[in-house]
Amino acid sequence: MPFSYLIEKDDETYLVPGVNLRSVGTIRDAQKWPKRDKRTDQQRLDMINYNLLSPYTIYKMMKAVGILKNLQELVGETSEVYYYQNTRIKGSSLRTALNLYGMAINKFLGNSLIKRLEGTDFRSMEEVWSQLKPTSSAGRGEWLDLSGLILPREELDGLIEKVEEGKITSLEAIEEFFAAMHSNYYDMEWTWAYDMLEEYYGVNLSSISAAQIVDLVRRWQDSVIGLDNLLYKDAKKEFSLTFMTGFGVDGSDKEKQEDFEGVRGAFESNPFVTAVKEHIVVKRALGDELIERMERLF
């Protein structure tokens, strides 16, 4: 199950599914790798996709949700402990995981929908339906992480088949395939998201109403802002007294805090914290803008 902790306690292994989705450390990791990529060549040999949420990770979350819901059905929703592959999952952890995975899935699918509909002043729902149609036939089914290149399994299987049949015989042709997969990522991602939006929310995107789109956007807003608020709370822990050990050793708690802020800065002015707060404002405005465009079509 993605974004999980494994904890050993009293000779028992506890699985805490999805908990890292609300962790500051996860977001910092996702942000640091693109910053460390100092390649300057226009033609890059390694195709690396840095997206934290992608068909690859969201597919894993959807599978995890299915497993967790199945455990609830088998054992009961009020159980204090669930057992999965030689690990224990606390009932509270399972319920939290379903909530976190749900928010992350809403966030990704909503991002895809909003991106698809951005920048167009629609005059009719027919125009909306037309813009929602996928432009790539590739992208359906399971996706893989191939050393940083995120691509559909079906496309990779097709490459392997062509190599085995002798239709592809050079490294240059394979490199061209990888480059094409990387450059066409967002088209293929939308093909996948299109299917998942229909399956997950039970909507028909070829005839979806403006009101249904507004409902999906509001669900996306709630999830994005909800996850950001959880990150905000997690960041606040790093400014608690327990994190101030070694600061103002001989002083009072007040002096310890002043020493800590002198080195690390105040919580509200911390760059990560200000970025989270700005992200909430930007995403709320982005959702409101699409809602306004859709409400004209009611």
Where on the chain are the PLM-derived regions?
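Short, flexible coil/linker elements and helix-boundary hinge sites characteristic
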Residues: 51, 66, 76, 110, ...
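Charge-dense, extended regions
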Residues: 175-298
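Charge-rich, solvent-exposed alpha-helical interaction surfaces
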Residues: 64-70, 74, 97, 116, ...
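An accessory alpha-helical subdomain
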Residues: 60, 65-125, 131-135
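Charged, long alpha-helical assembly modules
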Residues: 124-126, 130-196, 209
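Short, amphipathic C-terminal "tail helix"
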Residues: 99, 129-134, 138-141, 277, ...
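Glycine-rich hexapeptide-repeat left-handed beta-helix
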Residues: 1-76
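Intrinsic-disorder/low-complexity loop/linker signature
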Residues: 11-12, 86, 166
